[in-house]
């Protein structure tokens, strides 16, 4: 039966990683691995548009056949935003190597190699400069700003406030931070542009006015 990989710790500093490698001879069964992962350089600015990735849960595995098929320990998947919407296109496959080992865990023969792939790239229409500017306008406020190119229909900016830092979820957000996000009355996890519920208010007035003009009720 193949041995299962168990992740003891991740997101190690280079100093920690080097120290483990130095004592590796005295740590049988342990294998330090350098991997690639997500990084969100604009922090809160794109959080509601891009969403974030986090460790795949049992629900992710049961609801998505592709995630279940490609699951390996430590797999991170999209939880909301574009990360979740395009998960099946963005997810890659890991390189898998299987070895025959002796009683001491030493490799004696390579049995199988499956080369992985990176998955697809995704290009969006958001203008970073305008996106950051809308974030500055919303700083300290609760609300949202959305800007669309009227000729192409492309979304140039979509910002919701308050926001959150998607990098906090990469290696598991702690209980206190998660509780603070969920208990915040201004709902930083909600994209107010597309998920907020609002009464029509003055937005319906132009529609009523145009209808009245069309029917010669007003001039």
Regions found by a protein language model. Name each.
Residues 1-144, 159-192, 197:
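Extracytoplasmic/periplasmic proteins that interact with beta-lactams or build/remodel peptidoglycan
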Residues 20, 49, 134, 153, ...:
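Residue-level preference for non-acidic, small/hydrophobic
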Residues 54, 160, 212-218:
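Hydrophobic/aromatic-lined pockets within catalytic cores
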Residues 129, 148, 203-207:
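An amphipathic alpha-helix/helix-turn recognition signal
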Residues 149-156:
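Short, glycine-anchored, charge-dense loop/turn motifs used at functional sites
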Residues 166-170, 204, 213-219:
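Short, well-structured active-site flanking segments
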């Amino acid at each position: 039966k193949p041995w299962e990989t168990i992740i003891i710790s991740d997101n190690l500093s280079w100093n920690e990683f080097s120290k483990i490698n130095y004592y590796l001879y005295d740590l049988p069964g342990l294998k330090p691995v350098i991997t690639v992962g997500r990084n969100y350089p604009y922090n809160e600015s794109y959080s509601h548009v891009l969403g974030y990735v986090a460790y795949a849960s049992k629900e992710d595995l049961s609801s998505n056949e592709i995630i279940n098929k490609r699951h390996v320990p430590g797999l991170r998947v999209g939880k909301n935003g574009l990360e979740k919407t395009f998960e099946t296109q963005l997810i890659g496959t890991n390189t898998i190597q299987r070895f025959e080992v002796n009683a001491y865990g030493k490799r004696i023969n390579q049995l199988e190699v499956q080369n992985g792939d990176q998955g697809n790239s995704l290009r969006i229409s958001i203008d970073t400069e305008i996106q950051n500017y809308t974030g500055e306008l919303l700083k300290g406020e609760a609300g949202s700003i959305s800007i669309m190119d009227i000729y192409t229909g492309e979304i140039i900016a979509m910002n919701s406030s308050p926001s959150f830092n998607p990098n906090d979820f990469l290696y598991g957000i702690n209980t206190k931070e998660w509780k603070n996000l969920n208990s915040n009355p201004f709902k930083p996890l909600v994209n107010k542009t597309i998920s907020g519920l609002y009464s029509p208010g003055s937005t319906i007035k132009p529609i009523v006015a145009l209808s009245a003009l069309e029917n010669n009720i007003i001039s």
